[in-house]
Amino acid sequence: QYFHSNIYAIAEDNQGEMWVGTRGNGLKIGDSWYRNEVSDPASLSENNVFSLFRDRKDRMWIGTFGGGLELAEPTTDGKYKFRHFLQQKFGLRMVRVIEEDDNGMIWVGTSEGVCIFHPDSLIADSDDYHLFNYTNGTFCSNEIRCIYRDTKGRMWVGTSGSGLNLCEPEDNYRSLKYEHYGTSEGLVNDVIQSILGDNNGNLWVATE
């Protein structure tokens, strides 16, 4: 039943249900499919689901490519409705990756930089987040491909074209200090596809 869709993301919720995000065919939760319905503002905003993330309060966040960030909210009939975020303030519609840091802050990688927020605050006020990108001098590329939290709680951000960045929030997340690593520091390519740490503290970086 999945094989006719291009699968981009898989996650498991706290009930043991599998969530499957596809390119062009929406989101499958358990046995139910969820897709964009133009007449229903509580439906999925976009059928391209590129990332799924379960936060420490077991909320399920959905990154769409074209419709921004979604929060799945259960309904009384056992189904889900979706709240939409990040589109209004900066028009952040292209979401590739979602990660959480040790402080419970959510980091969202978009085509316009990294968006950081506390989930409780964003739910209360959809404009309560910080955006870091090339425009405000944080990264050399706005296109974020991956985000990884290492065993020391440090956040690594991989970009498309400007390498790898080790990021450290400052001033209560109002600014972001970073160290940049690119081809001049030994990377084969500045397009970062994936990041993973091993049990020895090494960081493995996949590039183009």
Question: Can you name each region flagged by the protein language model?
Answer:
Residues 1-208:
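Carboxylate-rich, polar loop motifs that coordinate divalent cations or form catalytic acidic clusters
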